[in-house]
Amino acid sequence: MSVSTPSELDALIEQATSESIPNGDLDLPIALEISDVLRSRRVNPKDSMRCIKKRILNTADNPNTQLSSWKLTNICVKNGGTPFIKEICSREFMDTMEHVILREDSNEELSELVKTILYELYVAFKNDSQLNYVAKVYDKLISRGIKFPEKLTLSNSPTAMFDSKTPADWIDSDACMICSKKFSLLNRKHHCRSCGGVFCQEHSSNSIPLPDLGIYEPVRVCDSCFEDYDLKRHDDSKKSKKHRHKRKKDRDYSTPEDEEELIRKAIELSLKESRNSASSEPIVPVVESKNEVKRQEIEEEEDPDLKAAIQESLREAEEAKLRSERQKASRQMQPQQPSPQPQPIHSVDLSDEEKDSIYMFASLVEKMKSRPLNEILEDSKLQNLAQRVFASKARLNYALNDKAQKYNTLIEMNGKISEIMNIYDRLLEQQLQSINLSQQYTLPQVPSDPYNYLTENVQNPAESYQTPPLQQLSSHQYKPQQDVSRQQSVKANSSPTTNIDHLKTIDVTPHAQQKPQSHVELAPSDPPYPKEEAEDEGTQAVQDEESSTQESRERPYPVETENGETSINKRPQGITRYDFPTVPARKFVQPESTVPLPASSSEIPIKEERPPSPQEELLIEL
């Protein structure tokens, strides 16, 4: 029956301590099966302890079932293994045991059984710091006058009755404990259910049941444990069994003497061969002693694999010897030339032999944890391996320091490169920004219509004060009359203060000097501008324009001179003549009068050249 959960274990415990069994007995095969379940750890030890405690508390009213439950507890304690014993010695279960001892006075058989279990636990684990609560409960019961059975005689090793073989705790490692191969995504790790070691797939591909550990289903085991169980099942001869057990022991804990000797010789030959490439030192042939020959003969008789390995190493030694002799003969035939000796390269990295020694030492130390101390101290091969590993500690520290310095240097260089790249990016951004600004200020905005661009500059001369001066028109250049009139009108509009000053200085004639309106006769009007007058007036306008332009270039503001009134009086005539060519509705005809004119009338011709009235000036400005 395969039990893997606490509920299944409860059912099995009820079956072993059934009420149908008389006289407080129990079903012994089922009880042993329960102990195998506890020893194999298929159920957690704490859960197992709670299952037994629950059965004890539930059967407190039935003396027979209570007795069978404690008998089952005694069997499980002595066959359940150390993890289960730790849970039994905890406060949770020991308080229940103390309560039963103090309560059961009528049932002597049950009381004696519980006292016996407690006393055996006290004698076995009273010096254990992890299980010291048993001693506290024992002292408490002694102080209350509880007497324990004195007829119990324990052997020299009181823990022997509780020493049951259990599956070993799993060991974690990053390499196989047999071939020392590193674990990776493809080379997965596997634990042996017997020894708890970690191995690769190649060395843990066997599956067998482990009845001595309470495991009756095939589980994964390593090659060493598989050979051990295979030898137990197929015990053909005592000699074969003894030899294979010796091989397993040597593989697990130390290197055999002959194998260590062969490895040492192979290393010496390889070192001498490497030295011969740089120097002409002869290789001393290895002379095997008689003891070694006898040992080799024994090994050849016992193990064919070891025999093949020895032959292979001897063959390699012979080949190295022949190769060195050939090199020596070729050097003697060639003329002697001074060959430059290569400079020795000091390498701080560990060699393959040192790495193998470290891995082998680590795996052996893990396996030696479960062995007694005297075997560890007496193992000379393990001590030699430890000395070799400790000798390589200085080189390992130096190599680690060298790698750390290189790492720090690379980190510093990476930081400098990132800082330089940031500075370079900042400079590029500044350069691009300056190029964009220069393009904005240097590139002119070309208008879509050049004629509009020209007319805008001509129609807005008031804005030319902030720009370079206009080119002065020569007398022979052609200029339309319409443009001249436009410029004059703009000038009149752009200088309102001048017109206001002109209005202030206008001399208004008295009503006595003006002729009455009744003498004016209305008649059809003639053309306002004859051809000759138009030409004369155009020439006069060009000259006035040139003079006004010259004055505006010299000084942008009007200059107050002595003849300021005369200049002001002349400007409205030009404005009236060209800007507003209006035709009067009727022509003024002056009737002949017999009244003689005064002498000053010839000096001021009012009829022909009359200055504009203030009303006309206001109309012009509007």
Swiss-Prot record:
ZnF region ranges: FYVE-type: 170-230
Modified sites of kind Phosphoserine: S157, S495, S613
GO cellular component: endosome; endosome membrane; ESCRT-0 complex; protein-containing complex; vacuolar membrane
Superkingdom, natural source: Eukaryota
Keywords: Endosome, Isopeptide bond, Membrane, Metal-binding, Phosphoprotein, Repeat, Ubl conjugation, Zinc, Zinc-finger
Keyword Transmembrane set for record: no
Membrane topology designation: Peripheral membrane protein
Gene3D superfamilies: 1.20.5.1940, 1.25.40.90, 6.10.140.100, Zinc/RING finger domain, C3HC4 (zinc finger) (3.30.40.10)
Compositionally biased tracts (Polar residues): 462-500
Family annotation (Pfam families): FYVE (PF01363), UIM (PF02809), VHS (PF00790), Vps27_GAT-like (PF21356)
Biased composition (Basic residues): 239-249
List of residues binding Zn(2+) 1: C176, C179, C200, H203
Gene Ontology MF terms: K48-linked polyubiquitin modification-dependent protein binding; K63-linked polyubiquitin modification-dependent protein binding; phosphatidylinositol-3-phosphate binding; protein domain specific binding; protein heterodimerization activity; ubiquitin binding; zinc ion binding
Gene Ontology biological process: ATP export; cellular response to nitrogen starvation; late endosome to vacuole transport; microautophagy; microlipophagy; multivesicular body sorting pathway; positive regulation of protein maturation; protein retention in Golgi apparatus
Sequence segments annotated as region (Disordered): 236-260, 317-348, 462-622
Domain VHS: start-end pairs: 18-149
Comp. bias intervals (Basic and acidic residues): 317-328
Keyword Metal-binding: yes
Comp. bias regions, Acidic residues: 533-548
Annotated domain remarks: The FYVE domain is involved in the binding to phosphatidylinositol 3-phosphate (PtdIns(3)P) which is required for the association to endosomal membranes. Both IUM domains are necessary for efficient binding to ubiquitin.
Function: Component of the ESCRT-0 complex which is the sorting receptor for ubiquitinated cargo proteins at the multivesicular body (MVB) and recruits ESCRT-I to the MVB outer membrane. Controls exit from the prevacuolar compartment (PVC) in both the forward direction to the vacuole and the return to the Golgi. Allows VPS10 to return to the (trans-Golgi network) TGN from the PVC. Might also function as an alternate adapter in the COPIb clathrin-like coat.
Oligomer and partners: Component of the ESCRT-0 complex composed of HSE1 and VPS27. Interacts with ENT3 and ENT5, the ESCRT-I subunits VPS23 and VPS28 and with the COPIb subunits SEC27, SEC28 and SEC33. May form a complex composed of VPS27, HSE1 and DOA1. Interacts with DOA1. Interacts with ubiquitin.
Name this protein carries in UniProt: Vacuolar protein sorting-associated protein 27
